Amino acid sequence: MRSASILSAALAAFAPLASAADAVSGAAEGFAKGVTGGGSATPVYPSTTAELASYLKDSSARVIVLTKTFDFTGTEGTTTETGCAPYGTAAACQVAINKDNWCTNYQPNAPKVSVSYDKAPFNPLIVGSNKSLIGQGSKGVIKGKGLRITNSAKNVIIQNIHITNLNPKYVWGGDAISLDGTDLVWFDHVKTSLIGRQHIVLGNGASNRVTISNNEIDGSTSWSATCDNHHYWGVYLTGSNDMVTFSKNYIHHTSGRSPKIAGNSLVHISGNYFYANSGHAMEADAGAKVVLEGNVFQNVVAAMQSGLAGKVFSSPDANTNAQCSSYLGHTCQLNAYGSSGSLSGSDTSILSSFSGKNVAATVTANDAKNVPNTAGFGKI
């Protein structure tokens, strides 16, 4: 009995100690207001990649705390095959994996190239309902795999982690965070970097109520579809019935899809800092209803791609912005531009779509100027 007690004490000495930092910080604003994730479940501390995958996928309510880097690189082997180079063969250009015969069907005239890629990002970590995934301090890193929330999973919080290194050289190399068929999802203070395909993707099924806040979408890369060290595949919001709050995020060194919105998506974009975009930031295509307010566009060639069919209210002037108060609960705030193109769109007909819904509090462009200092991993 005494030896068993000694063993138990020894094991306890090496177990991670729970702290106040091992709980969700703050609460979601906007459409995902009320999300609780794993709630008051006792925190668990995965020590292996297999244990992390198991905790995320199971049916229990969980608070999962990451205390180190979980590196999936090479865990499922690599593949060498023929891909294509639709954007050119220069060293700074992304080349493409022939995923689902994409090269064959859509880029038949592109030069054929050999591609060697890691297989792990093609099998993302599946996240079940009632989960909080939290990074401890600046330690919670997932390398070589993204997260996928799908199959009616709901009530999920992802906070203070860094997802990185998903075959960044290759189009179709992997998505960092993907949602399809969900409800009540909040990801906050997450950094994504060196991603092959989308940093964030919602669709094609309904993602319903989602809040994306205080994240850093880092598009800096050595390989891009625009061959200029700016990642093109940023944020893709095209779910069939989505309400998305996109607030206080830092999106930088991208060249497109920052974000792209279509499907059937009601989106509130407020208080974000868009920086160093070599192409265009927002795309609003058919099915998009978008309000943009209190954002900063700094060194963005085009704040918005023109000629698309989405409905946009860009908070164009103080008088028009006052109409927001009846529907969003506050007067919409002007956006700010520095060495950038400007937004267009003053479709007030979409404002009523926000009436009676959980809308995030107003943020001014002056507030948004500090977002690069507060958004992302390790900044809670």
Swiss-Prot record:
Glycans are attached at residue 130. SUPFAM superfamilies: Pectin lyase-like (SSF51126). Residues 1-20 form the signal peptide. GO terms for molecular function: pectate lyase activity; pectin lyase activity. It catalyses: Eliminative cleavage of (1->4)-alpha-D-galacturonan methyl ester to give oligosaccharides with 4-deoxy-6-O-methyl-alpha-D-galact-4-enuronosyl groups at their non-reducing ends. The keyword NAD does not apply. The keyword Translocase does not apply. It is found in: Secreted. Its main location: secreted. Its EC number is 4.2.2.10. One of its GO terms (cellular component) is extracellular region. Transmembrane segments: none annotated. This is Pectin lyase.
